[in-house]
Design a protein with these regions (language model features):
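Post-transcriptional modification and biogenesis factors for structured RNAs
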Residues: 1-234
Length: 234
């Protein structure tokens, strides 16, 4: 999280007990630490612990059940963020938050997977984190109170806002070269992108569909669009 979102925590939050893991038996895990693999994650690390400032003593003691890749097991949140920072992409993602949509958390989780430069929550400050599975702690999440705030940020940083929706004048995503400095903009699950936010975008792309449904799930569309940007620019 970032300092411009004080209501949601300011600087990155430390891991909470619900993220930690306790001892469980299982097949061998990381041989370098001699850990026991748990249902999810790894168990407590046997002592002596490695002399590594990136490691979190509480995670070493209790185990690590967080949704992180194996190389980040036992690392503190701050250490993971610092390690990810040099490889963050130029891509940003904006999500309209009008109805506390569950899909917002899923989009944030995908944004973490692609290590985007930032996520912008447009509208309501509080957003549905359930689908994020705490992955928002490792990326920058900004709150933009309104469309004008997002548009001003994008202009000031040289970014092009591209809506991912299916208005009549949208272009097929799969034949579109996305800008490198791009903000992919997503709306709510049922209503799509609001007219005001759509008007603030410099273009719109749609994902071609071949079935009977008018639109696909917005979280699925976000994953496809982020992947397409990554294919072009990573």
């Amino acid at each position: 999280m970032t300092a411009d979102d004080p209501d949601e925590g300011g600087s990155p939050r430390r891991a909470v007990p619900s993220e930690k893991g306790g001892p469980r038996s299982g097949p061998p895990g990381d041989p370098s630490l001699g850990t026991a693999r748990m249902g999810v994650g790894v168990g407590p690390a046997p002592q002596p612990w490695p002399d590594d400032p990136r490691l979190d003593p509480e995670l070493l003691r209790e185990g690590d059940r967080r949704n992180v890749v194996d190389r980040y097991r036992y690392w503190s949140v701050e250490a993971i963020r610092d390690d990810l920072a040099p490889t963050r992409s130029a891509l940003h993602v904006a999500i309209e938050n009008l109805e506390h949509d569950l899909n917002i958390g899923s989009i944030v989780r995908t944004a973490n997977a692609f290590n985007v430069g930032g996520v912008h929550i447009v509208g309501r400050r509080r957003w549905n984190r359930r689908g994020a599975l705490v992955t928002d702690r490792y990326i920058d999440v900004h709150h933009r109170p309104g469309v004008s705030d997002l548009a001003e940020w994008a202009r000031g940083h040289g970014y092009t806002m591209v809506a991912v929706d299916n208005p009549p004048d949208s272009a097929p995503l799969e034949s579109t070269r996305l800008p490198e400095r791009c903000v992919l903009v997503f709306g709510q699950e049922s209503a799509g992108i609001s007219a005001g936010l759509l008007a603030a975008c410099q273009g719109a792309v749609r994902i071609e569909q071949y079935g009977s449904t008018r639109s696909m799930n917005v979280a699925a569309a976000a994953a496809i669009a982020m992947h397409w940007w990554s294919v072009q620019h990573r």
